[in-house]
Every structure is written in C-alpha cells, then in structure tokens.
C-alpha cells in the first residue's frame, strides 16, 4: 500500500482499497447476465426460439422493474448493511443465471428478467455509490470514484472476451452451436457473479454504512432538494447520457436484422 500513500491517498482509503476495487468489479459483472443477450443477439434468439419483439420485452421489463426499484433502493441502502445488500444482489443475480439454464418459456423468461431488474438495480447501485463514499477518506472521495469507474471498465474489458471464449468453447463441444454456446456463456456469467458476491461479503467492511437518525432524510428534505435547479440539470444530463448508452445496445440487433436473414418480426 506504499504506492497508494505516494499517490496521496488517506489511511482509510488505503485500508479499504481492495474492497473498493471488488465493489467496482461487481458493478460491472452484475450486468453481464441481464445484458448478454444483446452481445449474442442472433444466437440467443435462435437458442430460445424468440422473436425480436419478445427480446425487446425483456429489456423493457428489466428497465421498468429497475425504475421502480430505484425509488426505494437508496432508502434501504441508508438503513441496511451495504455489505449484505451488495452481496445478496450479486449472489441473487448469479443464481438467476443458473435458473436460466432450465428450459424456460417466454413468460418464465419475462419473470426472470423482472427478477434481475430487482436484484441488480434495487439497492445495488445506490449501495455501490455509498460504498465508495464510506470506504474512502474524506479527502479521497473524488479519486476513489475515479478508481471505481476505472476498475469497472477494466473488469468489463476482461469479462467480455472471456465470455466470447466460453461461447466458442460451447460451439466446439456440441453440434448445436447456439444452444451449447449460450449455455456456456450463461454458466460463465453466473459463476463469476456469485463469486464476486462472495468476495464482497468476505473483504468488505461495514464501517459507517448506516446513518444516524439525525442524518435520515425527511420528505421536507426531499422537497428542498427538488427545488434546486442544479438537481434537474444533473438529472437531464444523466438521462441524455443513458439514452445514448442504451441506444448502443440496439446497434448489434439492428445490424444483424439488416445484414442477415431476420430472426422474426
């Protein structure tokens, strides 16, 4: 940790640096299962006999449940152990991946994506943000968020090619290429998601994760915040950013539909 000291990080940040990186990795890994079908769109559609519309429903239901969950996740993150919430979110999402290995029909898949919308968004993201704050020294919060976002990117860069290798391994192992490849990808994402949850449970501390009664937010406080113009500007910027980011996920299916035989309308 001498290197971290040379970088000017405080004692608390140095002590919890590994935990911050594990939370960051989990913040990337947990979304592998809900979103992997965009990366393997055609193979996923063929393996599970899905239409383009049905796959679109998965994204919609995941987003709706996530939006509802966000309304309550922050409240829960202030009152329950963030270590426990992060671990349960990761492990629950991973177990959902193992359920995906069963021969599920369309309504059952909709229920699964609804479940993922709850486990990966409900308290997970508010807990990620809070974890970085409580694990960092007061003077290091900006640097810690930088390390957090950077580690998320590194985890994603490592995870994605490994998933491709898993898919390729499945294609070589079975004549039913798409089905076997998809199963290998699901197993890969499920295992690393559960493993990530166990690592967070093992390495993370709960110091300062619960707020005192004097710090609890009231409806009057919420009203005060909502009257701040800066809050609405930040919300608009965030909305525009996510619209662009999520639009990227549709490039793959759209290009496949136009350059190859369509799956089904």
Show where each model-derived region lies.
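Cytoplasmic helix-loop-helix junction between adjacent transmembrane helices
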Residues: 115-151
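Extracytoplasmic gate region of multi-pass secondary transporters
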Residues: 37-39, 230-256, 260
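C-terminal ends and interior cores of transmembrane alpha-helices
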Residues: 91-105
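Central cavity-lining transmembrane alpha-helices of secondary-active solute carriers
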Residues: 60-74
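Glycine-rich segments within core transmembrane alpha-helices of 12-TM secondary carriers
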Residues: 145-168
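C-terminal membrane-cytosol helix-exit motif in multi-pass small-molecule transporters
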Residues: 190-210
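Juxtamembrane intracellular "pre-TM" segments in multi-pass secondary transporters
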Residues: 2-13, 207-233
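Extracytoplasmic
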Residues: 18-43, 50, 248-253
